[in-house]
């Protein structure tokens, strides 16, 4: 009996089925600048250089981390794709870039076209929210490489910003303020600690109703990462945004510090925003100290804008009108011993 690729663990027919299932969905993200059809070796995107005096391309890549373990355990796969897009576009947004297009990498031990399509549906939804086109991707079937029914994801975003409009935080000065925009929950960071606390220490079940959360645990943990593209572009021409920070791994201290000039520190008021119940649950079950919580999790703030003091009310009004919960969370001060002080 002769051996075949399928017997070795790679099912090309299933891959072809997958492509046929996702093609019409993916096309719904296409912008007018997309020049290619699905299935070519490369994606082509012709952005309008006339819109920019000196266009600069901006790129970013990221994954979803161990949040995927929650998707596996709950057998719910239609939101982690949103997380993937959010993690990438929110990063390139921090320098003022408009997301143009996105590519994904999906790898699994045995391809299940239906399940993989659910993941792509989430990526498509995320791309639509961010305004970028999904112009390509890679699907890798890797026998005996992953555990049964598991997969991994990576995403790649490319955007553009005019060179004179690049935002890097260098103009932040004493007296400027920090506007925090609410997260939807854990987003896509800290899940290794969250899972350890909730499942190993707390002995909670993925399908268990948690009164403090007013929902089952899986629903809370799989809330998609917020996408902040519309928030920035609502502010862009009305407020001078001097810096932006995407609050991911490392929390507020680890991420806000990345954009502050050497002589500037941030003084933040932890009582100025609402910390979602999931963080209190993790803190209480795990008996985790507050400093560690802020170091690992976003603690309810997913994105931070730095603006001048006289634009506080305008910024808050614009963001709230766009449907974002925004708070004045602190101010910039002259350099001290600690880069970030949360009190």
UniProtKB/Swiss-Prot annotation:
Where along the sequence do coiled-coil regions lie? none
Pathway listed: Purine metabolism; IMP biosynthesis via de novo pathway; 5-amino-1-(5-phospho-D-ribosyl)imidazole from N(2)-formyl-N(1)-(5-phospho-D-ribosyl)glycinamide: step 2/2
Where in or outside the cell is it found? Answer: Cytoplasm
Its principal location? Answer: cytoplasm
Kindly state which reaction or reactions the protein catalyses.
2-formamido-N(1)-(5-O-phospho-beta-D-ribosyl)acetamidine + ATP = 5-amino-1-(5-phospho-beta-D-ribosyl)imidazole + ADP + phosphate + H(+)
KW Nucleotide-binding (keyword) present: yes
Instruction: Quote the EC number.
Output: 6.3.3.1
Entry keyword set: ATP-binding, Cytoplasm, Ligase, Nucleotide-binding, Purine biosynthesis
Please provide an example of a Pfam family that matches this protein in its UniProt record.
AIRS_C
MF terms (GO), sorted A to Z: ATP binding; phosphoribosylamine-glycine ligase activity; phosphoribosylformylglycinamidine cyclo-ligase activity
Q: Which domain of life is it from?
A: Bacteria
Question: Which GO BP terms sit in this record?
Answer: 'de novo' IMP biosynthetic process; adenine biosynthetic process; purine nucleotide biosynthetic process
State the InterPro entries in the record.
PurM-like_C_dom, PurM-like_C_sf, PurM-like_N, PurM-like_N_sf, PurM_cligase
**A Gene Ontology term for the protein's cellular component:** cytosol
NCBIfam families from the xrefs? purM
Q: Which family does it belong to?
A: Belongs to the AIR synthase family.
Matching HAMAP family: AIRS
| Protein name in the entry | Phosphoribosylformylglycinamidine cyclo-ligase
Q: What organism does this protein naturally occur in?
A: Thermodesulfovibrio yellowstonii (strain ATCC 51303 / DSM 11347 / YP87)
